[in-house]
């Protein structure tokens, strides 16, 4: 009797792709987040309300939301459109855009589960060689699917009933 199913596959971080819209005030122009970045993960920062009733020995917890953010340290590469967009916002307040998360390990026929979120970008440090920034996800994401052709994603929101 096998304890591990035979169809288990190891996911790679390159299969969880993130794109930033570098033209947020017009038609989306998605650029990959990844050039010059060796490590990045989305922190969910869950909000949990805890309450312990006097008649119980253990507390109750209510997961009320997430405060997602992506903290990035990126080596600077001239002509990388995503870096150029981040760099242009170094001294700007409320520098907003959109972020697209695509799970390419879960797709069928070139269509992948995806989430699009509004976001706020803040630069925390810049040395010329590296730039550090945080992308704060705003509100609930729009669920949908994405296809990727020539490195450019096309997002299609899921229609709700």
Where are these regions (language model features)?
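Structured, beta-strand-rich domain cores
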Residues: 59-113
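Solvent-exposed edge beta-strands and adjacent loop segments
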Residues: 2-73, 118-129
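Extended hydrophobic/Leu-rich segments
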Residues: 8, 19-22, 102, 155, ...
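Short, low-complexity, polar/charged sequence segments that are solvent-exposed and flexible
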Residues: 89-95, 118-122, 152-157
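Short beta-strand and beta-hairpin "edge-sheet" elements
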Residues: 100-143
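Intrinsically disordered, low-complexity acidic/polar segments
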Residues: 81-83, 142-145
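Surface-exposed, hydrophilic segments of mature proteins
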Residues: 23-29, 108-114, 147
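Intrinsically disordered, low-complexity terminal/linker regions enriched in Pro/Ser/Gly
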Residues: 145-161
């Amino acid at each position: 009797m096998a304890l591990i199913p035979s169809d288990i596959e190891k996911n790679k971080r390159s299969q969880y792709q993130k794109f930033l819209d570098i033209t947020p005030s017009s038609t989306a122009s998605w650029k990959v987040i990844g050039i010059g970045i060796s490590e990045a993960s989305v922190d969910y920062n869950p909000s949990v309300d805890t309450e312990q009733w006097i008649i119980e020995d253990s507390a109750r917890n209510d997961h009320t939301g997430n405060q997602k953010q992506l903290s990035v340290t990126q080596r600077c590469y001239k002509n990388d459109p995503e870096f150029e967009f981040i760099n242009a916002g170094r001294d700007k307040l409320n520098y907003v855009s959109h972020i697209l998360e695509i799970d390419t390990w879960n797709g069928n026929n070139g269509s992948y589960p995806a989430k699009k979120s509004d976001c706020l970008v803040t630069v925390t440090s810049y040395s010329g060689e590296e730039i550090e920034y945080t992308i704060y996800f705003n509100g609930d994401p729009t669920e949908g699917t994405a296809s990727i052709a020539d490195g450019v994603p096309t997002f299609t929101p899921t229609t709700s009933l």
